[in-house]
């Protein structure tokens, strides 16, 4: 059956020629698309063609195109059936290990605390959370493995290295956007809210996460 007579006639539109391929690739890479920066054109395409695209992904790939919002900021992403499998589409969120999840929970907390403020963060802001926040002992235990008055330069460098690795992954997922990677300067995006949905049990029992991390590391 020719595409003009199919359920996917939207693929013949001029906008599909401009944006569909990039949008499709980006979604299948696990990215959350928001009206921000270079993703704005993809967001507009998804917004205008949401119903058609949702049918397309469910029919052909067995996955679901979701539209959600956080603080009235909308974002799009591909979701998977409960068995975690789609046809020819990899579940990128399964790449997250416990340390990624811990850092994601930290950023989610920061996002919520800064509800009416800019969500920009620098490394010194994160260090301040580790050292001075009300939850500092929890974060120190989760990130360093134990609570101490002082940490060695090597210990701090290792936490920073892991943080950079995690932030690079979160940038690919669309959960943060780099402003200046060389100085660990970034903005937390509305889609960080996905952490709350993917890892609700871990967030509810965050004080047990350190045990989980160390068990996985053995």
Name every feature range the model reports, one short phrase each.
Residues 45-53, 154-172:
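Short amphipathic alpha-helical interaction segments
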Residues 1-95:
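Eukaryotic partner-binding/assembly regions in large regulatory complexes
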Residues 90, 94-120:
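Positively charged, polyanion-binding regions of nucleic-acid-associated proteins
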Residues 54, 58-68, 166-181:
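A short, conserved structural fragment
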Residues 11-18, 122-131, 161-166, 170:
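Low-complexity, serine/threonine/proline-enriched polar segments
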Residues 72-78, 183-190:
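Minor-groove-contacting beta-hairpin "wing" of winged helix-turn-helix DNA-binding domains
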Residues 30-36, 117-131, 137-155:
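Short acidic, hydrophobic short linear motifs in intrinsically disordered regions
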Residues 91, 192-218:
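Short, amphipathic alpha-helical interaction segments positioned at domain boundaries
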